[in-house]
Amino acid sequence: MRYSKNFDVIVVGGGHAGTEAALASARMGCDTLLITHSIENLGAMSCNPSIGGIGKGHLVKEIDAMGGAMAAATDEAGIQFRILNSSKGPAVRATRAQGDRVLYKAAIRRRLENQPNLSLFQAAVDDLLVKGDEVQGVVTQMGLEFMAKKVVLTAGTFLDGKIHVGLNNYAGGRAGDPAAVSLSARLKELKLPQGRLKTGTPPRIDGRTIDFSVMLEQPGDLDPVPVFSYLGRPEQHPKQVPCWISHTNEQTHDIIRGGLDRSPMYTGVIEGVGPRYCPSIEDKIHRFASRNSHQIFLEPEGLTTNEFYPNGISTSLPFDVQWELVRSIRGLESAVIVRPGYAIEYDFFDPRHLRHSLETKAIGGLYFAGQINGTTGYEEAAAQGMLAGINAGLAAQGKEAWLPKRSESYIGVLVDDLITRGVQEPYRMFTSRAEYRLSLREDNADMRLTAIGRDLGLVDDYRWEVFCRKQEAVSRETSRLKDIWVGPKHEIAPLVTQLLGQELSHECNLTELLRRPGITYEAITALGNRIWAPESLDDDLGLAAQISDQVEISVKYQGYIERQAVEIARQEHNETFPLPEGLDYSQVLGLSKEVQQKLNLHKPETLGQAGRISGVTPAALSLLLVHLKKGLGRTQETI
């Protein structure tokens, strides 16, 4: 049976990737259908009840800058907010929020149900409709066919998912949800290269059985209270609560070692590779054998539940071992587990076989986003989902894809890393992955991406108005700083001397003062109304802090940012220099066999991508350029 209506875009999956994909496509005016096996679980935080962190917070800000939902939903559901790396430079500062699971799901569902052009349907998708090498639609478990111009697949850990607790295992996409076995088999039939990965989650603990009096309290930031969205305000936050810190000990480690003979990871039952940067407690004990303690964060799961998430003891050990290891931790001696920890193994598909639009090369009109591409984390999934939704929508409208560059966004870094290098383990974003991170800060994601989002039809009138007011205010305040001069004989020179700790030797403007070490924008504005009489910083919109941060950072780091801009411009040539799709690299004279094999395997689309493949040297790129300029790189089809 075929559904009576055809769609522009169908999104399969209602997790963080799927919800952002569906919202993006619908905001662009595409008739969009989101199919999920459970409407109640739309936007569910399946593992850690938190959003953001180093690199991850940058992605959330970028999603928000383009009108996405994750940041705004977090502001409505966050029960603790912190700025990580607050004492370090602006490039690596990152927002993190502890979330209330119930409030977050409600915030996401509300946005989905009230988004024009977006329909929801509850069903499991078992099959894809493919004609030739183009996707036509999907088929649900009950045999109902939905037709669409484009399909975005965001299946998370559900593709042939298998849950492990000790040596027991069973099919499942996550605890309580079925695996997508038929859909995974169908994708394998289409000859899409795949592999297996693994992730895990810790046991959940009844907070009434935790002794917090012997733990270290970890409160959120209070002055100021952070927000995630550029349109967010602290007043939107629900009640704020602390997290708590404890540690494992030698007894804990002995218990874990004693259970390794029943660990699915250490007995070969699990074949999938787990995340390097979020290892299980078994992995920590094995890899860091010399350490006698590991930090554990007790994180509340919400305001209306007693459950706590013990961040740091993800495990797939048998339940009896989990019980013992939890009770060996200080403050958890009487703890009661309400949900056991487990590992989940699932299929992913090699992202090197995707285009930068996240469309599969093998099947036209089919887009992949999220853990299906080998990533880990809500934020990485949401960023890919938004990009896939954008490009599916653009393709449905007959328009060119939007391909974010590494130099303009962490989204661009994420996608380029996946497609150029592939994954051997679940991919997690860090600021260290971005070579231009000083230009890709949390504070300026809107300056980088909101205008692009507006052009794509993603940014509504209100967000655009707020952005324009902020942009104008930053420009106006920066100009004002340049226009105000202070000299050794100026009436407020003594105040400047006190501020600097030394006398002024020559006349300078306020931007020069602000560039001095230890001098802040706040200190400059406090010099006195006689030289500084700023207009309102749009505090009616809650923008004052954003504007002052932008002004201070852009002034203090101007020289570094300008040098980075020159470097970016220099790299643009390689980045956009196209490589013929059918180029046989074994015919390029002078390239080593290793480089030839890697280039033929990865099939980079541009010279810039080729240069980021491990083992491809600048000398190899020069040989490739010579080859192309001689015309030898043209394929039969392009001649």
Curated annotation (Swiss-Prot):
FAD binds at G13, G14, G15, H16, A17, G18. GO terms for cellular component: cytosol. The keyword Membrane does not apply. This is tRNA uridine 5-carboxymethylaminomethyl modification enzyme MnmG. It comes from Polynucleobacter asymbioticus (strain DSM 18221 / CIP 109841 / QLW-P1DMWA-1). One of its GO terms (molecular function) is flavin adenine dinucleotide binding. InterPro entries: FAD/NAD-bd_sf (IPR036188), GIDA_C_N (IPR049312), MnmG (IPR004416), MnmG-rel (IPR002218), MnmG-rel_CS (IPR020595), MnmG_C (IPR026904), MnmG_C_subdom (IPR047001), MnmG_C_subdom_sf (IPR044920). NAD(+) binds at residues 274-288. Homodimer. Heterotetramer of two MnmE and two MnmG subunits. One of its GO terms (biological process) is tRNA methylation. It comes from the Bacteria. Pfam families: GIDA, GIDA_C_1st, SAM_GIDA_C. Keywords: Cytoplasm, FAD, Flavoprotein, NAD, tRNA processing. Its main location: cytoplasm. Gene3D superfamilies: FAD/NAD(P)-binding domain, GidA associated domain, C-terminal subdomain, tRNA uridine 5-carboxymethylaminomethyl modification enzyme MnmG/GidA. Belongs to the MnmG family. Its cofactor is FAD. It is found in: Cytoplasm. NAD-binding protein involved in the addition of a carboxymethylaminomethyl (cmnm) group at the wobble position (U34) of certain tRNAs, forming tRNA-cmnm(5)s(2)U34.
